[in-house]
């Protein structure tokens, strides 16, 4: 028996392993590629993971790049982190990109291509107003915190 919350999962590709953590305290579980792919430098490819999940309302799945692949190969995720909404029930797919300027990246079926992190999320409604409360920062945006008086 485990004290971790259970997420319902459908294995769409029975030959691939279920997502799992490498270590008990890891935030993310590994996602595996359903197909082989060659991603040319600067190009992207949408790759299936062979799973669909049912997230509880008030949670979100975030698909992150794997740090080792990013560092060694230049493999990343175009929209990192990818967002899996609680009401989505289709296959989780990952839009991979090759950031290496010269070398293609080979993806082999079964490779661990991304990590899925499940988080609680605050669901809110928006209230339209004419103006916002004043703050010390105000409307100072990009680069404003690096300025000195």
From Swiss-Prot:
Magnesium as UniProt keyword: yes
Cited Gene3D superfamilies: 2.70.40.10
GO BP annotations, alphabetical order: dUMP biosynthetic process; dUTP catabolic process
Catalytic activity: dUTP + H2O = dUMP + diphosphate + H(+)
Signal peptide (UniProt feature, chain positions): none
Enzyme class: hydrolase
Pathway: Pyrimidine metabolism; dUMP biosynthesis; dUMP from dCTP (dUTP route): step 2/2
Residues where substrate binds: 66-68, 79, 83-85, 93
Cofactor: Mg(2+)
EC number(s) recorded for this UniProt protein: 3.6.1.23
GO molecular function: dUTP diphosphatase activity; magnesium ion binding
Alphabetical UniProt keywords: Hydrolase, Magnesium, Metal-binding, Nucleotide metabolism
PANTHER family attached to this UniProt entry: DEOXYURIDINE 5'-TRIPHOSPHATE NUCLEOTIDOHYDROLASE (PTHR11241:SF0)
Family, similarity comment: Belongs to the dUTPase family.
Purpose: This enzyme is involved in nucleotide metabolism: it produces dUMP, the immediate precursor of thymidine nucleotides and it decreases the intracellular concentration of dUTP so that uracil cannot be incorporated into DNA.
Protein name: Deoxyuridine 5'-triphosphate nucleotidohydrolase
Species this protein is from: Corynebacterium glutamicum (strain ATCC 13032 / DSM 20300 / JCM 1318 / BCRC 11384 / CCUG 27702 / LMG 3730 / NBRC 12168 / NCIMB 10025 / NRRL B-2784 / 534)
Organism taxonomic ancestry: Bacteria, Bacillati, Actinomycetota, Actinomycetes, Mycobacteriales
């Amino acid at each position: 028996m485990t004290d971790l919350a259970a997420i319902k999962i459908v294995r769409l590709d029975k030959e691939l392993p279920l997502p799992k953590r490498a270590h008990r305290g890891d935030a993310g579980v590994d996602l595996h590629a359903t197909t082989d792919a060659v991603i040319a430098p600067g190009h992207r490819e949408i790759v299936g993971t062979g799973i669909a999940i049912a997230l509880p309302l008030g949670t979100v799945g975030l698909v992150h790049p794997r740090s080792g692949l990013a560092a060694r190969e230049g493999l990343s995720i175009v929209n990192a982190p990818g967002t899996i909404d609680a009401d989505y029930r289709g296959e989780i797919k990952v839009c991979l990109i090759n950031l290496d300027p010269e070398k293609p990246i080979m993806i082999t079926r079964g490779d661990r291509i991304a990590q899925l992190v499940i988080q609680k999320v605050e669901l809110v409604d928006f209230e339209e107003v004419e103006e916002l409360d004043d703050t010390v920062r105000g409307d100072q945006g990009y680069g404003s915190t690096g300025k000195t008086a």
